Amino acid sequence: MTYEIKTLALSAIRTNGGTQTRVQLNAAAVKEYGEAMTEGVHFPPVIVFFDGTDHWLADGFHRVQASMDIGALSIDAEIRPGNQRDARLYSVGANAAHGLRRTNDDKRRAVSVLLDDAEWKAWSDRKIADLCGVSMTSVSALRRP
């Protein structure tokens, strides 16, 4: 499916809705991205889910922070239909196959997001593993400590 790519004001992107599944931002990566941006390097668009009112950031927290740090006012974004919950679900698998590698703590947090949710925790270990980009064994270990 093809989604609209649009330049969004950074101030229009919601980053405070629990859609960041990393434990913390990597300050070195943010700095590196900011330096590259000032040199004209073009980054892929961030991914946001738009519910008609808010643009919920699902993937691209380091790029958004780097953009803010260098004083940019906008960023290219891929706009997908959906709400905060959709963005949160998407975010658990963000960077599983590309971008800044996730730490083991990041992976555990992604799985925990699903296991702590009333609906999502009913899903099979396989489904959660596939969505989070981790092994089924990892999900099982977190589900049954």
State what each model feature region is.
Residues 1-80, 91:
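Short, charged/polar connector segments at secondary-structure boundaries
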Residues 17, 37-41, 96-97, 115, ...:
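Generic secondary-structure transition motif, activating predominantly at the C-termini of alpha-helices
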Residues 26, 85, 104-107:
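Generic alpha-helical segment signature
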Residues 29-32, 87, 91, 110, ...:
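Exposed alpha-helical structural elements
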Residues 52, 83-84, 145:
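Short secondary-structure capping/turn micro-motifs that flank functional sites
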Residues 80-81, 142:
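Residue-level "edge-of-site" marker
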Residues 82-101:
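Basic, amphipathic alpha-helix used for nucleic-acid engagement in HTH/winged-helix/SANT-Myb modules
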Residues 97-145:
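Alpha-helical interaction elements
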